[in-house]
């Protein structure tokens, strides 16, 4: 850099030509710029703007920190502090300043320093607050005394002319000063304006006086500190977990800015919405936890192309839901039979006769009247099978004759095998289904769920053609199809092996009453129902 260019450069920085020539003569024209600046600083040279602030050519640099304004000692008598560098905003809360507390805090509790009030007012004015009120007792306008020193009292006059300062009333009575309670003015005006109280006083007496004021003072009190001539309110007026100073002074606080620090776990993070770090892979959708994401994916998968589930209780309905929860006991009992089926059963069993001495093998030929009219009775009590035992069996037990798996119809009951033979076959097939649960055993035989007292029917009853209008056939009529191996062979072959089925089919007449009684007694000794599979 040439000598001339260096001279112009340092003169633009504000140094005088004499100082620059002196330093360059000492260090030489080939000296570096940093070395020249260091020498100028060490020799005490300063720019002209700082040496002569009152000159018209100098530029006064005003700091933009919290102080915001030059001290009153550095300002000229006619100069006003620079305010309003931020545009006024109606969203800022009104400010009510406790003038006595602020002035005494700035005077270090020794003097009433009016400069502290000016610094506080200028700080809020620079932030853009338009409503600022300072309350000071009126006796502070009196001349300063040794017991009550007042500094820079002219500041109060300036603030009063600007309609910022308000004097609270006070007077003298019999030579004694009567002062009104200025704190009540401060709290009342701030409460009505929904503003901020600037003071280091807690106003405990006023908190106990009014519960509404208690909450307001706790939430709207702004404390402060003075660092030399710098007014410094805290950045967190209500504590570390409270709002920031900007939100505290605003009517509509802004939400906190999100943290842009990337999560150290990246895509492997399992905190979900609770993670306080930034995830760039989740910019356009809400952050969900892992469990919520799995639930959402499961719902979408079931609702999109899932097949309609089916319930395991209905074999005849393949489209019933399987995965849907079932109510307890919903499929434990079979559905009630239709009224027409009950009426047909009542007509069919109206001619049954029972033996009171069936255990001895003597069968009674007597026949009772039609004691079960059509559609009327729903429960009945059969005769006692043994001495001292009487069982009441209800007709609703017959509902098991019609189930979703085996509906009762005349075609199903029209089997060429007599009921005694079918009962014998059911007893022989008990071992085949003993390992199945009770509710899952096959119900292909409607005689399987009949009470055991049906086994003691008179032999002549089965031979009557009026029984069920040929629905059930007697032993004499069923012997012919059995011997011929008619329509019963497919039924037997489906449940019994051929080596057991052929001898039974070729034995001629069906089982006698004595054989049937022996089978029934054996079933009763084991304790299992006769028709239980």
UniProtKB/Swiss-Prot annotation:
BP GO terms, sorted: 3'-UTR-mediated mRNA destabilization; mRNA catabolic process; negative regulation of cell growth; negative regulation of G1/S transition of mitotic cell cycle; negative regulation of T cell proliferation; T cell proliferation
InterPro entries membership: Rege-1_UBA-like, RNase_Zc3h12_NYN, ZC3H12/N4BP1_RNase_Reg, Znf_CCCH
Start and end residues of each stretch annotated as Necessary for interaction with ZC3H12A: 262-368
UniProt main location, coarse: cytoplasm
UniProt keyword list: Cytoplasm, Endonuclease, Hydrolase, Magnesium, Metal-binding, Nuclease, Zinc, Zinc-finger
Superkingdom of the organism of origin: Eukaryota
Record-linked Pfam families: RNase_Zc3h12a (PF11977), UBA_6 (PF18039)
Start-end of C3H1-type zinc fingers: 251-282
PROSITE patterns: ZF_C3H1 (PS50103)
Signal peptide positions on this chain: none
Tissue and organ distribution: Expressed at low levels in bone marrow derived macrophages.
Cofactor dependence: Mg(2+)
GO cellular component, one term: P-body
Chain intervals for the UniProt region annotation (Disordered): 302-335
Domain RNase NYN: residue ranges: 92-246
A molecular function GO annotation: zinc ion binding
Chain coiled-coil ranges: none
Listed EC numbers: 3.1.-.-
Cell wall biogenesis/degradation recorded as keyword: no
Localization in the cell: Cytoplasm; Cytoplasm, P-body
Keyword Magnesium: yes
UniProt similarity note: Belongs to the ZC3H12 family.
Subunit structure and binding partners: Interacts with ZC3H12A.
Task of the protein: May regulate cell growth likely by suppressing RB1 phosphorylation. May function as RNase and regulate the levels of target RNA species (Potential). In association with ZC3H12A enhances the degradation of interleukin IL-6 mRNA level in activated macrophages. Serve as a tumor suppressor in certain leukemia cells. Overexpression inhibits the G1 to S phase progression through suppression of RB1 phosphorylation.
Name the UniProt record assigns to this protein: Probable ribonuclease ZC3H12D
Annotated organism of origin: Mus musculus (Mouse)
